[in-house]
């Protein structure tokens, strides 16, 4: 596993299709950002998604959380799995329904071939339910090794609008918040942020 030292941008995808789905997503965000080690910078709107693969199951609510952390990616994964367990996550069925699922999509330029933590996420480039909320939260984002999220989203066939293609629908009636530290802009708690300056 390789990657730069110091604080890094982390992209986290959250999903839930059991119980109170919105409350599960919010609880996941709250658990991840409860301490100083993971600082939220933006959270997307909520998207509703038809399940992909696995047994017949309810639709998902999905969102993307952007954060900054100096923790190693493995430690961030541990935090994600702890948050899942707090919401009663069970892993009995592959791609089965779940109260809360949190995936690390990217961690700056870090790469890993570890089967327990592959970075960047090996299927994110084809998942509209990850790309649509990520593009909303950071329109200038790139998925390392795959290119601009905007281009990947176009190929995935999801517009991100209400009734959009690809089984992904933006839920403007639902809202998530992320605790922001003093000095951060409150407008980053939900919805798009300005594209990052990615010049050299």
What are the residue ranges of the model-derived segments?
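N-terminal beta1-alpha1 ligand-phosphate binding loop
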Residues: 2-38, 44-48
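Short, structured patches in soluble enzyme cores that scaffold and shape functional sites
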Residues: 14-16, 69, 135
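Flexible, gly/pro- and Lys/Arg-enriched active-site loops
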Residues: 37, 51-61, 71-183, 191-200
């Amino acid at each position: 596993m390789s990657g730069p030292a110091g604080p890094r941008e982390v992209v986290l995808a959250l999903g839930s299709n059991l119980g109170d789905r919105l409350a599960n997503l919010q609880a996941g965000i709250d658990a991840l950002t409860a301490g100083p080690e993971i600082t939220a910078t933006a959270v997307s709107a909520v998207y509703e998604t038809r399940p992909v693969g696995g047994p017949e199951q309810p639709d998902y609510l999905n969102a993307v959380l952007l954060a900054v952390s100096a923790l190693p990616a493995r430690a961030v994964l541990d935090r994600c799995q702890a948050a899942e367990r707090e919401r009663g996550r069970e892993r009995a069925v592959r791609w089965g329904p779940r109260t809360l699922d949190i995936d690390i999509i990217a961690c700056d330029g870090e790469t890993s071939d570890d089967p327990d933590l592959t970075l960047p996420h090996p299927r994110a480039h084809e998942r509209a339910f990850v790309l649509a909320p990520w593009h909303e939260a950071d329109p200038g984002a790139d998925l390392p090794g795959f290119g601009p999220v905007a281009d990947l989203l176009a190929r995935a066939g999801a517009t991100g609008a209400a009734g959009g293609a690809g089984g992904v629908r933006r839920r403007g009636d639902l809202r998530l918040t992320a605790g922001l530290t003093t000095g951060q802009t409150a407008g980053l708690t939900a919805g798009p942020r300005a594209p990052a300056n990615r010049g050299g």
